[in-house]
Structure formats: structure tokens, C-alpha cells
Amino acid sequence: SLVPKTIESPSLSNRGCHDFIQFNEGTTDNRLMPFEAISRAIRHALIFMARHQIPSQCDAKGDANLRLAIAQMLNHERGMHAKVEQIGMVASTQMALYAIAKTLIHTNDFVVFEQLSNPMARKAFANCGANILNISHDNQGIDIANLELLCVQYKIRAIYISPQHQLPTTISMSAKRRQELQALSERYQFFIIEDDCHDFNFSNQASLPMASQAKSNNTVYLASLSGILGHALNVSFIVAQAEYLDACAAQITLMDGQADQVSQMAITELLKNGEIKRHRDRSLKIYRERRALIAELLQAELTEFINFTLPESGLAIWLELSPSINMLRLQADAELEKVGFIPTNYYASSEHQVSAMRLGYAHLNEEEISLGIRRLKVAFMNQQGQLLRA
């Protein structure tokens, strides 16, 4: 295989080097955060809590006002019919995944993942005793025939998907595949765990989540505001039927018995006064420019080595590499050129290897993107025996 068998977590590699350009999974640029608005909202929350002697801990499901604001946002922007009692706040997406796994999964239950998928989600379910089954996928989404075959062979408990912007390939699942998946879920009675990455869409035709469908009682939906707010205020949320949400909340209490009331009150203010929407709109314009730049540079500088389709949503691009590229050597050469990327095997099941990489670009400014692509070009060309320096 051209792909190395092991890879250090991308979050640990050269992150401290100020001159090292790291293309990540697709996070936002923390330098664009509305720091004044955030600090003002936190100050308001602290003052309110002190004056009214409100405990620093809140309900296991989260602050009621925040849950109401989230419900209104989801129903207005994502076409859902969420009720406050169906929404639970969580400190992070990873904690949400683990709570869902602990709630839904019993030892040796079968859970389906795409062959290329979120590795941390895979680990969360495996840690809770799940047997992981891998399913193929293409440019329309999951292979429905493959899934139905698994349903015949095994008693499937759940499937994990990110249909809006598949991690890592960036593909959006087609409407037809979504309908077929919903039908299979109803027929074979398994849960759909929908991880919705919808914060930044560059088209006017963003698809609605599967949880917005009328028959979505078997869908557990999770999303996050951290994609918009970055690390300034980490918050994720789960939307599920009330009985499952109650069980998730019990698990969350065991993991994090001190839900951050200050942060949740601050986020509520930012949602209600429109600051989060304004920040998202401002950021989208900047990310659109960065998206156009990296697409232009990839076409101009790396077209002989890669193939890609520019996605309509998300903040990353999936690059399929030429068969002649040795991934292990490319990583080493890129490291020498002070540029990093996330290779396929970080996301791949053990039996599925593809020579590709994911380039998250939004956290980099235009100068950093340009420098990073130039350095990547050097790394690619070194495989041809050409020595260039960025």
C-alpha cells in the first residue's frame, strides 16, 4: 500500500511551530472571532448570576433559555420540528457522541460506519462495546445496497453518518440516498445518528438534515456551535426523542457534572441578539474568498498530482492523489518543507486504504494558504527528483 500503516494524530504534529503551515480538518479561524461581543455576553452572564445568586451549574440538559433558542434556530434554519424537551446541551461533539453511544449501544451491538469516517466517532462506539461494520460509499453517499445486505446479515443497532458534508470526503448525500436510508431504518429498526456539519454553505441550495423529515423518530441528531464560535465558547447539542435524551443527559452528568452555566447564558445572548448569525455571515464572505484562492492554487500548482471536486459546503477540500504518489514519502517531504496535512488512513477502516488527503483551509489567511500550497508542491515534486524551495 502507498499509505503508511500508522500515523500520529494530526493535532499533535508540529502545532507549536509558528512557521509551520498545518492544513487541518476544516476548522474556523479563531482570529475572526467577535471577541468583544463574546466577552460582553460573558460579563453580562456573570453579573446576572451574581446578582440573582444563580448556581454555576445548570440542568443536566442545559440552560432552558439556550435550549429554546437552539430549537428556534433549528426549526427556522434547518426545517426541523424540535421541541425544547428534545434538546440537550453538551460541552463538545465528542462528549455527545460518547453519551449517545453509552445510551444506545449494548455490548456486541452492530454499528455501521462508512469506510472513510470520523475516527473519534468510531472510537467512541467501539469503546462502548459496539462491533463496527464498514460500508462503502461513493459520490452520492452511502451504498444502500451494501447497507441492506448488512441488515440482512446482522441485527444493526445504528448507523453513523454526516450527510451534509461527509467527513472526510466532503460529499453531500443525495436526496435519493437519504430517502432510501430512512426507508431501511424504518424497515430494519435501526437508529440513524446524524452528525450535521452545516455551518458554512457556499450555495443557495443547502439540503435539510434527515432529522427534519416527518418520520425521524429513529434519528439522533447532533450538531455544534463551535464551528462558528471556534474555541471561544465550546457547545454542542443533541436532538432526540425525549426518552433517549433523558438517558443521554444522565450519561453526560456522569462525565461532566458541572455544565457551564456562564457559557450557556452567554451563548443564549449571542443567539438572541443576532451576533452569531452576523458573525457567521461575515466569516462566510472571508471563507468564500479563501475557498476560491485554494481552488485556484490547487488547479495551477498541483493538477498533475491530484484530482478534486470543490465542495459546496464545509471548510475543507478532499484531494485524491495520483497512483504514482507514495504517501509515506510525501508526508516526510512535506514535514521537511514545514507543511502538514491529514492523510486518508487517519479516517480509514483498517481494511480500506485510499491515497488521498483532506485540506482544511479556513483557519489560514491568504498568505498562509499560498505558502502552504507552494510548500506542498515542493513535496510532490521531490518525488520526481526535483528539488525546489518555497
What are these regions (language model features)?
Residues 28, 163-166, 227:
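Short glycine-rich anion-binding loops that position phosphate/pyrophosphate groups of nucleotides
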Residues 87, 190, 219, 306, ...:
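Short, conserved active-site loop motifs that form the nucleotide-linked donor/cofactor pocket
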